[in-house]
């Protein structure tokens, strides 16, 4: 699954990096899907790609994933606060926000801790997971310290798991 025009773009990058060696594999072994929305085979999931707020050169988009149980996951991509995220958040069960900058200035293309807290206050019924975190992970003393966010907001670490059952109920399991 990739953006419209992505097959041509990725194929040309592969040709530049590995001339003549990947074309057959890309044509014969890869199933390309460049649709903006659709169904993920026999998984019970469908998706919709939507625009978010980041530098246009990065083709900024997020994905709304909807399970046949009604469970909705909103992955906002690399983005700052924006109307499209706000519009979709009210119907989501879980929202994944990137938090790429600390509260040291204005950064319209990234969420800061204050933006994430404000989002949580507007959408208290939604489980918020933070990724693309500017801060260091737990137990790492270098870099920016982990910001103090409300307990309702989970700052993802490598190894964390979101388990969704057959009824659309979910639990967040932190790494050991």
Which positions does each model-derived feature cover?
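Short, solvent-exposed loop/turn segments at secondary-structure boundaries
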Residues: 106-110, 140-141
């Amino acid at each position: 699954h990739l953006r419209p025009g992505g097959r041509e773009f990725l194929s040309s990058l592969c040709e530049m990096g590995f001339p003549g060696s990947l074309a057959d594999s890309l044509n014969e072994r890869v199933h390309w899907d460049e649709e903006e929305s659709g169904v993920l085979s026999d998984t019970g999931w469908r998706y919709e790609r939507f625009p978010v707020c980041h530098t246009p050169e990065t083709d900024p988009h997020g994905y709304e994933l909807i399970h046949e149980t009604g469970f909705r996951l909103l992955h906002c991509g690399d983005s700052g606060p924006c109307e499209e995220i706000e519009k979709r958040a009210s119907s989501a069960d879980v929202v994944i926000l990137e938090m790429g900058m600390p509260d040291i200035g204005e950064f319209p293309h990234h969420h800061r801790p204050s933006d994430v807290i404000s989002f949580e206050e507007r959408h208290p019924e939604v489980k918020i997971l933070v990724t693309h975190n500017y801060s260091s992970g737990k137990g790492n003393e270098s870099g920016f310290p982990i910001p103090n966010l409300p307990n309702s907001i989970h700052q993802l670490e490598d190894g964390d798991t979101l388990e969704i059952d057959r009824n659309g109920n979910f639990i967040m399991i932190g790494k050991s």
